[in-house]
UniProtKB/Swiss-Prot annotation:
Protein name: Small ribosomal subunit protein bS6
Entry GO CC: cytosolic small ribosomal subunit
Any GO BP annotation: translation
Keywords of the record: Ribonucleoprotein, Ribosomal protein, RNA-binding, rRNA-binding
Keyword RNA-binding: yes
Length: 117
């Protein structure tokens, strides 16, 4: 099956558990349509470069999936219809990277710097 990576931005007024619940919800959508959610990372609340739907911040999540194209199209369709999801980006990749994403690596480096002080 093809491999995909998705980045989702959810509204800032959601709690962290609600944002994680969105990830689980869309993972079940994939599994119901014959795919699977391989891995996901919650990047936290980040400030955006410009306002989207009058929001300056958003909950960012990164998902890796192994699913057929119709399952991904259905998940994207439901994400775009969901009121809590502001933006979705999906790309098809040849293989998933084993390491954490660049955003998570940056977070770990920042954590190391804070401990040194």
């Amino acid at each position: 099956m093809p491999l995909y990576e998705h980045v989702m931005i959810a509204r800032q007024d959601l709690s962290n558990t609600q944002a994680e619940g969105l990830i689980e919800h869309f993972g079940t959508v994939l599994s119901d349509n014959g795919g699977k959610l391989v891995d996901h990372e919650y990047w936290g609340v980040k400030t955006m470069a410009y306002k989207i739907n009058k929001n300056r911040k958003g909950h960012y999540a990164f998902l890796r999936s192994d699913a057929p194209a119709p399952a991904v199209h259905e998940m994207e369709r439901l994400m775009r219809l969901h009121d809590d999801v502001m933006r979705v980006l999906t790309i098809k990749v040849d293989e998933h990277a084993e390491l954490p994403s660049v955003q998570m690596q940056k977070r770990e480096e920042r954590g190391d710097r804070r401990e040194r002080r």
